[in-house]
Structures are given as structure tokens and as C-alpha cells.
Amino acid sequence: MDKQAERGQSAGPVKTPQGTQPPAHNYTYHTNAAQRAVYDYLKNVKPIPELAEPKTYKTYEEASVEAVLYPIIEKHQVIMVAGAFFGDEGKGKTVNAVANHPGCTFIARVNSGENAGHTVYDDAGRKFVFNLAPSGLLSKGKRNYVGPECVMDPISFMENEVKQLIEANVPYKEQLFIGNVSIVTPYHKLLDLLASAPNSSTLKGMAPIHASKVTKRGIRLDHIFNDQSVLRSRLRKDIDTYFGFLKVKGLSDADVLRRCEKENGDGVVRVPPYVVEFVQAEDKVEYLVKLYMDRVRNNKNFPARCDVAHELRSALSRGEKVMLEGPQSYWLSNAREKFWESTTSADTTASGLLATAQYNFQLYSSVVINVHKAPGSSRVGVGANPSSFVAQDYFSATGVKTLRDLPENMCVDFDSIQKLFFTKAFHPETKEYNGIWEPLEFEDSTGKYNIGVAMAVASSRQHGECGAVTKKPRVCGFFDCVLQYEVNAVQGPYLSISALDRGDDYDKLGVTIAYVYYNGKNDEVLNINGREYKNGDIIKAGEAVPGEVALYYCHPIVKLINGWKQTPIAASKRKPGDPLPRGVCEFLSTVEYFTKAKIISIGNGPRGKDIIYIKQ
């Protein structure tokens, strides 16, 4: 085990800072000596008094959407629904609830691109997977817009999103309008594929297209609908980046084609056929011009175009309410320096939505509804994730692209795994309980597994935690109050927690209330924003969140909450109006205490109507 591999969290595979990762991570399924050594240090950390907080728990009661959500909407002209963690929080349900308010008539996506993925259901129970299309398309009488600061691959948009609407007979021609978006071309997606670490990107071309955008190269949608000579000229200028990359890397078209075939080799189409055709095309610019003429400009099914920012301002001036549907999340925003190396390429905070919506925020009142998910708070891709069951890049580093890459029967007994984890790995019965978990072993017919690995795999299986875009298993973990506190301080207080009915499956739940810093080296000190971080330092909710280079070495201090297995809250098992179980009230009280958020709703099932509004 090399020194790099000794830098790990107490129960999962080790964490290594981005940019300094060695070729071999030495991740294992079983508990290794390095993890035991980390635990031997962390188990002696002095307990923090906050583990005994809150002293009392609030009582929460169910109320109607009209009593809880609608008064918030009615006080404001612009309602933003924003992710509060690392994306995939289940925002669609809250988006639908806001969209269904009678006064909310204008619904828009105003930034980012098809790397966002959300699953929504219409009133008939039909499932739709949208990336750029606003969820309001499934609500009657709503106008839906994709704003000009979004980035769009129009071929993918038509094939994967508009096609769903056509097949379901959704009258999108009267409901969906597209602004002068920046165009994601096949070479942007190929640059993403060729330049990204394995399994670290959605392969949707986000970083390359935003690079084209900020350097004032590339094309926008209007270029496709106007003079073809201008379109050709701009494409020739922008594509130089792609050709230059191939030259520097010594790659031929044949090399790129083999890479595409390898990426699609497991049956999941990550590189679409038209991108492969682009690689094979002799004259790539002419291929693109013809592609866009045939499948965008001359396509009668392409949605109507308009000046979205002007339409939005006009709607506000008429007294209409506007909903901005946030992609990704606060901590995935490229405008947040704490995680900037491992984020998306747009500002996906609420302030980023406000800026790209292009309205006068001095004239119109706005409000943010943040959405988090628990249990099973998750992240995809690479980067730090202090509250995760395993290192954030565990699946990527071990070559797991989808759950099919794991042994079929590996860690399928979720109940036994969660029971071992929450009732044996923690030791709350001891006087010196400090919120650190012990790296126990779980064994099934396929082998022995570190309990963190077992929880990560079992959670992904049990909760269906795979990317809506990539199908990659998400890395799950505890609800993180340290990170949520900052989200609340910047764009709170309203918080909706989705998927809380998952708690029906747990004996206990964990909430991260602080971190302890430990890098495995006694004399190594990190200086982040003027503060020095050394082994044993505690970072509590409400304190400054350190940069990602320090967060790789942060380990969660976990407060345990009693579960509610005997009184499930899932919509299929609970009658509306039934009292909320004590465990649910303990969980909500703990989150509110440590984050200062105000919880307005919890999700309790897959359907849009499966949501419990909270009266306090």
C-alpha cells in the first residue's frame, strides 16, 4: 500500500486529492490496513458536545400544499427551485408542485445543459426523462422556455426529449420556446470524452462548449437559421481547438473511433451515432452544416424560437409569476471555489439562475426553494464528498460504469447491510462515542466487503441511485449539515427533502454534523484561505467550509437518528393525515437545528403527488 493510499476515510476506500491521484488507487472491496490505521486515529478524537443536540425535538404535522407552499409562491414574483447538494436531489417533484400553482405561468431553464437529468411523471403516470426541457411541459396552460444562456445539442434534444413529447402527444408546439442557445457540437462531446478522466464526466461536452462560449467562438442557434457561409466560417474557427487537441495528443480519426466504440462497448450508448458519423466524416464542417440543416433548420418538429429574456421580463410586467428550474446544484456550481475543479461549467446556484434569467431583481421579489435528498444523499463524478460511504471516485477508479459491472449478487441484502452498519459500526452506547464509524466487514456469497463499500453498493441498488444521464451508480452517504448550512446561509431558508420514505428501510439514520480533518501524516498542515488545517481539527456546521484539497481529508462526525420502520411514511403505506413518526421528527429537528433551514416538505414516493407538506 503506497503512501497515497493511506490517506483515507475511516470506513471506505481512501480519498486522494484531484490532480495528485496516482495511476493505481489501491482501492479494495475488503477493509485494508490503511483504513484500519485511519480508524485507530479517529476513534480517539474527543466527542464534540453537539452530538447531544438538539436537546428537544420539535413536532411536525402534515398540512396542505395550499397552506404551506402556495403562500410562499404568492408573496413573490420569481420562484427558483435549486439543488442544495451535488445534483440529483429529486427536484422534479417540487418543480411540478410550483408549476401547478395557478399563478405560475412562465417556466424556464436559464443555464447549463443536457448534463442535467430529471425524471418526472404526468397526471396519467407516464414517465418522462428530461435534460433541458422544463418539467412544466407536463402541466396544462404553462409556457416553457429554454433560455439563451443554456447550451444545447439540438440533435440530442430532438432525439431524446422532443421525441418523447411527440410520442406522448404533448402539445409542445404551443408550450415550448427556445432562445438563442449556444450549440454543443459533436467535437465538444469528443473533447469531453478524450480529455476527461474515465467515468468523471457526463460526456455531454459541458466544459468544451463553455470554453467556446467564453472565448466568443462557436455557434448559437441563430447561426443555424441564417447565412450558411457565416455558419461554416464560425465552425471552421471553433473546430481548430478539436484538431489541435488531436495533433498534440497524436490521435487520428481511427484512434478516436476506437475510443468511441470502447465507450459504447457495454451496451450503454454514451457516444451517439451522429457523433460517431462526425468522426468518420472526411469534411467535418460540411457534415455539421448538413446535419443542422436537415435535422434542425428544416425540421418541422423543432420547437418555436423566441427572445426568452424579453418574454420573461414581459411576463413579469404583466403580473405573471415565473419559475426558474435550477439544474444541478449549489455545490456543483463553477462559481463556488470550494469544489471548482470537480464542478459543472455553469453557475448553478440560485444567484446564477437570477443572473442568467436577465430580469431586474430590484423590481421583482424572488424566493428560492432548496431541495436536498435523504437518506442516500448522493453525488456522481469525481471530487471530494466528506459524507460519502466510500471515496467519491471509488466506482470510477475500479472501472464500474454501471451496476451491471458488479457481481450480480454482490451486496444485495440491503437490510442486513444497513443493520450491521448502523447498529454495529457505530458505538453510541459508549461514554466516548464521537460519531466515527468502525470499518467492519460484511460477508455474502460473493465475498467480504468493507462496510462502507457494502453500504455504497447496496444503497445504489436499493434506492435506484444511478445517474439519469450517465447510468453511473451515484455515491451515497449521510445528509451533510456542514455543507447544507452554507447553502442555507446563501439562498435559504426554505428546504424540501425528497425521498425521505427511504427511511422506512433503516433501523437508524445518520446525519453529518461536523468533520474531523486527518491526512495520515503527523506533520502535514494545509493552509486554506488563511486557515491552517492539521490532524484532529474539527469543522462544524456554521464554520467556513474549507477548499476541496482539505475536504478530501475530512471525515464525517455522525449523529444517529432513530428510524421508523414500524411506522412507514411511504405513500403506498401511509394514510394522509397520519401523525409523522417520532424518528421523522427527530431527523427534521436535527437538520433544522444544524443548518438553520426551514423544512417545508418531504417526499414519500415516486409520484409527483407523493409529498408531505410540513406544518410546524
Swiss-Prot record:
One of its GO terms (biological process) is IMP metabolic process. Its cofactor is Mg(2+). Parasitic protozoa lack the de novo purine biosynthesis pathway and rely exclusively on the salvage pathway for their purine nucleotide requirements. The keyword Nucleotide-binding applies. Belongs to the adenylosuccinate synthetase family. This is Adenylosuccinate synthetase 1. SMART domains: Adenylsucc_synt. Plays an important role in the salvage pathway for purine nucleotide biosynthesis. Catalyzes the first committed step in the biosynthesis of AMP from IMP. Its EC number is 6.3.4.4. Homodimer.
